[in-house]
């Protein structure tokens, strides 16, 4: 039986209210970017090759959250913690060896770097640094490894950028494997976002015109004795079983993910003339105990390679439904309490933690749950200050392995006096065609919103009952049109 992907999910039910994201972003290559960041490749496959970073820990679910103290290089994350920005969530990113991370091709000269924001803080600037020519890729990243004069600085002018921005930079001359550090200095907090980008400069490594990247062996999970892992090779007509390579897991050693990845890559190189697997070393393909790219011979007629599994038993399914969290909680004389209901699928350990925006834990709960169990819990916050807060839910199996993680955002707000008619011009959407820059409306959430200045003011009139993305307070893109008063 072919191995099905492990089914993991955390369903977040918020009385019909979707989650919010606050001031987070990552280096991407969706439209114009030359290379994705290290953390980006923990969640998303590389553009063009499908490569991914593995064993990234919890940050693979939150690539937009590599946030730490600003002021680099004078202050900021300490040496050895630059890639993670000192965030415990991203600690795995601080591992540093020559073969630990997927490397994206790059050339010196004009290049485009791209950021994707899940929410867009006003911005002071973006800075880009690169490692020195003689840096040691097998030591933790430190200030000594980098040229501390940024090769590119883009001013943010203390305004909100769009949800995706591109920066044109001149990349210095380098050879081989280098690391670029991209720093987004937000303007309304004492924090910055740090993304390292693993790159390999073209023209300095082996030139292999006869081989094309076509897939990769990702050691994503351990297997069991009796399982089989195999390649699925495709040509123009679909899968061609004649080019399949199978590896039977017949020893305890081979059950480990890095071991079977190495063994499968080695077997491909030994048995297939049109395929090669491993990291490039000179003009050789060398299997490694980690992710092994797969290449196909030019002119072979083969197009791509995927990995399949045959297993003795299906993987367990895990899910956790969390309901009852409100979008906002008003601060009062009594401690804030979150009344939640949990429903488990599968035997698991469920963990919930509440953090404020500065990552300070305010409440936590953990307990083993059985399949189908329904449980009501109350989390009481240790302090209540107005602003952004997060409820982080984690699922672990009975062996303590993390199966999934999700973050849900909510706000604590100060008590407010209900607005009077004199405080606003219209009750939204009344008078829609009269909305101009500065127009104030009373929205469905009871708050007042003011139409942004030009060139954003035109969005204020873009609303129908079937197109609500700019509806103040509740639309998916309301912040592009309105300021909350």
Swiss-Prot record:
GO terms for molecular function: chitin binding. Residues 437-478 form the Chitin-binding type-3 domain. Keywords: Chitin-binding, Secreted, Signal. It holds the Pfam family GbpA_2. Probably interacts with GlcNAc residues. May promote attachment to both epithelial cell surfaces and chitin. This function enhances bacterial colonization in the gastrointestinal tract and may also be important in the environment by augment colonization of chitinous structures, leading to improved survival. Promotes bacterial attachment to, and colonization of, zooplankton in the aquatic ecosystem. HAMAP family: GbpA. This is GlcNAc-binding protein A. The lineage of its organism: Bacteria, Pseudomonadati, Pseudomonadota, Gammaproteobacteria, Vibrionales. The gene is gbpA.
């Amino acid at each position: 039986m072919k191995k099905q992907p492990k089914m993991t999910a955390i369903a977040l039910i918020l009385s019909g209210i979707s989650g919010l994201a606050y001031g987070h972003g990552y280096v991407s290559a969706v439209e114009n970017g030359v290379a994705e960041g290290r953390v980006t490749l923990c969640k998303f496959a590389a553009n063009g090759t499908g490569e991914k970073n593995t064993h990234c820990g919890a940050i693979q679910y939150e690539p937009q959250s590599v946030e730490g103290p600003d002021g680099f290089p004078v202050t900021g994350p300490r040496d050895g913690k630059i890639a993670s920005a000192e965030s415990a969530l991203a600690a795995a990113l601080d591992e540093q060896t020559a073969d630990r991370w997927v490397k994206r091709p790059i050339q010196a000269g004009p290049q485009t770097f791209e950021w994707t924001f899940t929410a867009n803080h006003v911005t002071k600037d973006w800075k880009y640094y690169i490692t020195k020519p003689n840096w040691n890729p097998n030591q933790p990243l430190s200030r000594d490894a980098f040229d501390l004069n940024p090769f590119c600085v883009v001013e943010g002018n203390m305004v909100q950028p769009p949800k995706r921005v591109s920066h044109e930079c001149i990349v210095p001359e380098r050879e081989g494997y280098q690391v670029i550090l991209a720093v987004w200095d937000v303007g309304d907090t004492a924090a910055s976002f740090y993304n390292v980008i693993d790159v390999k400069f073209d023209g300095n490594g082996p030139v292999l015109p006869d081989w094309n990247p076509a897939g990769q062996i990702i050691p994503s999970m351990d297997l069991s004795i009796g399982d089989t892992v195999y390649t699925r090779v495709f040509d123009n007509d679909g899968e061609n079983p004649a080019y399949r390579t199978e590896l039977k897991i017949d020893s305890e050693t081979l059950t480990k993910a890095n071991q079977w990845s190495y063994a499968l890559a080695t077997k491909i190189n030994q048995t297939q003339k049109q395929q090669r697997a491993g990291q490039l070393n000179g003009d050789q393909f060398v299997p490694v105990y980690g992710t092994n790219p797969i290449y196909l011979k030019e002119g072979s007629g083969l197009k791509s390679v995927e990995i399949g599994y045959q297993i003795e038993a299906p993987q367990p399914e895990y899910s956790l439904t969390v309901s009852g969290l409100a979008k906002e909680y008003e601060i009062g004389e009594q401690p804030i309490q979150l009344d939640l209901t949990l429903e488990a699928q599968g035997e698991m350990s469920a963990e919930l933690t509440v953090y404020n925006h500065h990552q300070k834990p305010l409440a936590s709960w953990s307990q083993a749950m059985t399949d189908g169990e329904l449980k009501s819990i109350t989390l009481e916050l240790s302090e209540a200050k107005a602003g952004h807060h997060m409820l982080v839910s984690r699922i672990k199996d009975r062996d303590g392995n993390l199966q999934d993680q999700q973050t849900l955002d909510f706000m604590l707000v100060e008590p407010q006096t209900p607005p009077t008619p004199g405080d606003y011009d219209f009750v939204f959407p009344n008078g829609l065609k009269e909305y101009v820059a500065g127009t104030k409306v009373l929205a469905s959430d009871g708050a007042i919103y003011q139409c942004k200045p030009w060139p954003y003011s035109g969005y204020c009139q873009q609303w129908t009952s079937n197109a609500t993305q700019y509806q103040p307070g509740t639309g998916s893109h309301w912040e592009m049109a309105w300021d909350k008063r």
